[in-house]
Amino acid sequence: MISISETAQAHFAKLLADQAQQTNIRVFVVNPGTSQAECGVSYCPEDAVEDSDIRLNFNGFDGVVDAESAPFLEDAEIDFVTDKMGTQLTLKAPNAKARKISGDASLNERVQHMLETEVNPQLANHGGQVSLVEITAAGIAVLQFGGGCNGCSMIDVTLKEGIEKEMIEKFEEITGVADITEHQAGDHSYY
């Protein structure tokens, strides 16, 4: 689930030496599976460990992960890096914003995953997002835009030249896209 480099393990062990006995490290994700997901590391006293938590054994301490965060911390890596600028603890969690999907995932799951991992990070630069409403029997992916995309004058270009092309290329079952958003231009609109 989570790999912690030997240098990071030594760093944690050193920090934990100044804490109460049986204090461990908790690794977590706030807002998992969303574009606002943020990972964190904190001290975890023994009395804060829940029955549903997952314990990972490391050199001199346990890593504690709550059940909700666990799938989003799959393949996460924690390292303690020293360079000419100093030292830094890094936590890379490639699945924090969208969990991995299995090879036999439904078309809806695969399309939603593509929107969450490929499209929404780009739209987030403009304060926008898109979600899948449904996929029709004719293979049309019906989408709804929000945030800065609502009312944006460039939405047709984003929809047809960006999202639709990517979806048709990636999913042979998709024949097109449709936007059901009731666009209202305002201060929130990007363009």
Curated annotation (Swiss-Prot):
GO terms for biological process: iron-sulfur cluster assembly; protein maturation. It comes from the Bacteria. Binds 1 [4Fe-4S] cluster per subunit. The cluster is presumably bound at the interface of two monomers. Transmembrane segments: none annotated. Keywords: 4Fe-4S, Iron, Iron-sulfur, Metal-binding. Its cofactor is [4Fe-4S] cluster. The keyword Ligase does not apply. One of its GO terms (molecular function) is 4 iron, 4 sulfur cluster binding. [4Fe-4S] cluster binds at C149, C152. InterPro entries: Fe/S_biogenesis_protein_NfuA, FeS_biogenesis, FSCA_dom_sf, HesB-like_dom_sf, NIF_FeS_clus_asmbl_NifU_C. Belongs to the NfuA family. Homodimer. Involved in iron-sulfur cluster biogenesis. Binds a 4Fe-4S cluster, can transfer this cluster to apoproteins, and thereby intervenes in the maturation of Fe/S proteins. Could also act as a scaffold/chaperone for damaged Fe/S proteins. PANTHER family: FE_S BIOGENESIS PROTEIN NFUA, IRON-SULFUR CLUSTER SCAFFOLD PROTEIN NFU-RELATED. This is Fe/S biogenesis protein NfuA. It comes from Pseudoalteromonas translucida (strain TAC 125). The lineage of its organism: Bacteria, Pseudomonadati, Pseudomonadota, Gammaproteobacteria, Alteromonadales. The gene is nfuA.
